[in-house]
C-alpha cells in the first residue's frame, strides 16, 4: 500500500460489527478466565495484554501503523518524545558506556545527553554532522554503543547524512538511531537509508494539531545484535526468567526488550486517549505534509529576498547548504519549519516576533497553525554560548513553523512584523 492508504488503514482492521474508527480502550487492566492464563502471559508478555502501563489496544493499533509507515518490524509508543529518546539510549547503554551524537540536534536532547546521561555514567561524544569520515571514526571508543542524529535538525535544519553515518556506525558494529520528527515517514524513511532505530516526538507533525504529547520508537528488525557488543540483548535477562531477546524475539529484539524492561520499570506509556488523538492526526499526515512543504518554500523564498534578513535556513531552498542532501533524502519536500537570522540580533528579533498577529509565540512546532520561537531564549536557553554555536544557533535566529493558513496571510503577517523594526 502507498503511504496515503497506510495512514488510514494500517494497524486496525475492524471485524464484523466492530467500530470503523480505532476505539478508545479506557481500561488499566485485562480479564482472563484463569490464573494459569495470566501466568502464561507474564511468562511471555508479547502473547497478550497485561497492564496499560506498557500496552493497550488503542496504542497497539497506533504502534502497528507507525511501524508500517517507517518500514520497521515493530514500534513502542511513549508518553513524550523525550521519553522515546531516553528509552532508545538506555535500552542498549549502561553506566560505563558511551555513544556518539550529532552536534546539530534539539536543545532538550543536548541537555539529556550532556547532563542526565552523564549523571547515569553514560558519556555522549558529539561530532559535527559535516565532519569527515575520519573525524567521525576518531570519536569511537571501545565502549561506544550507538550513533544518534536528526533527519532535519531542530532548529538549525541541518540535513543528516543518514547513509554515511549508518555505514560508519555499522563498520564499528553499532546501530544508528535517527530522530525523524521533522521529516516524518511521509518525507523520509531512514530505515531505507540504513538507520536501525527510528524515533519521533509524535506531538509534532504526526499529531499536527497540538492536542497530545507523545513519542515513539521503531525497531527496523535488521540490526545484528550478536556481534559481542550487546550482552543485554544476547545474554539471559535476570528480570524475565532468563529470556535471551535475540533468540526468543529475533523479529524485533530491541523493541521487545524496551517494552519488557524499560516500559515495565519506567511506565512512560501514553494514555489510550492520547493514542486515539495521535491516530486521528496520522490519518491526515500526507495531506498536511504536502501543504506544509508548499507553504514553507513560498515563505522561505520571501524571507530570502527580504533585506532585513541576514540568512535563511531551509533545505528546500537551492541556496541552502544542505539542499543536495535534501534532494537525496527528502525529494518530496523539507517540511514546514524555517530558521532565519534577523539583522540586529536578539532585541530586534524580539521586537519583530512581538509585532506578529497571526503567528503565535509558543514553545511548539509543526502545528497546523503558524507559530514562532526564539530558540536561544527558549528551547536552547540552557545551553552555553559554545553549545549554541555548535548547534548552529545565534541570538538573531528565529524558528518559524509554517502552518496551514493561506500562505498570503502568513506572508502579510511577516511583512507587518518587518515593518515594525
What are these regions (language model features)?
Residues 15, 31-35, 224-225, 285, ...:
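Short, acidic Gly/Pro/Ser/Thr-rich loop/turn segments
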